[in-house]
Amino acid sequence: MGSLSSALAQNTYKLIAGSSSGLPDPDGPTPIIPDVFSTWGDYYNYLQQKEHDGISTDTVALMAIAKHNSGKIVEHEHHYKPITFGISLTKEIGKNWNVETGLQYSLLKSNFILGEGEYYIGRDQKVHYLGIPVRTSYKWFNSKRWSAYSSAGFLLNIPIHGKNSVRYVTGATVPYKDSWYFTPSVQWAVGVGTGLQYNLIPKWSLYLEPSFNWYIPNGGAIHTIWTEHPFTITVPFGIRFTW
């Protein structure tokens, strides 16, 4: 859909959810909207006042959703554990000490629900980040194939892009869908971890590194697992080159 449609969808969601929706300002033309509503009854009354011949499909769906809900409008959000894959470049600086950098891709998925039961507005969010880690590690176990180590350092996560997909659900039907792209904020993190490494061939290995991280508040409006749960355990895995 065009930018106007996406702008309308974003503003409709922000109109109902309020400032806590975590949505950025939309691209494209911005429709005139009243103050944010706090109850479903108020929102339904507003939609009835707008009702006219040739009413749009999305407004009909919103009226049905508002009619079948009551009380205060509350947004429920759920954030999934991130998926993180890395390519690590590790330099040995002593018998057991290493320094590391590389690239680390992370996918953050969340869903948000406005409404209850079979009548609701659902929003699925995906945010893609490319991280640059800088860490030091100490190897405390080493054999021919396996090694174990502990690490500490920081990570700069650079946003690639984000996408929101919204759907209006009325019983067994989904009469309206839309989606739009956005750019989230840069995200810094510091953390510690303990990793397990399997040596494939000389210099090349696979690793799995459960880590405890603090994602430093970035002041952005987008809600992710990193912003809502800044102290988070992640389990990066990937390929490592050591020299």
Region locations from a protein language model:
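Residues that define the transmembrane beta-barrel architecture of outer-membrane proteins
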Residues: 11, 79-83, 126-130, 146, ...
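Transmembrane beta-strands of outer-membrane beta-barrel pores
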Residues: 19-25, 105-109, 140, 154-162, ...
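C-terminal structural cap/anchor segments
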Residues: 132, 136-141, 146-152, 165-170
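Predominantly the C-terminal beta-signal and adjacent terminal strand-loop region
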Residues: 183, 187, 199-243
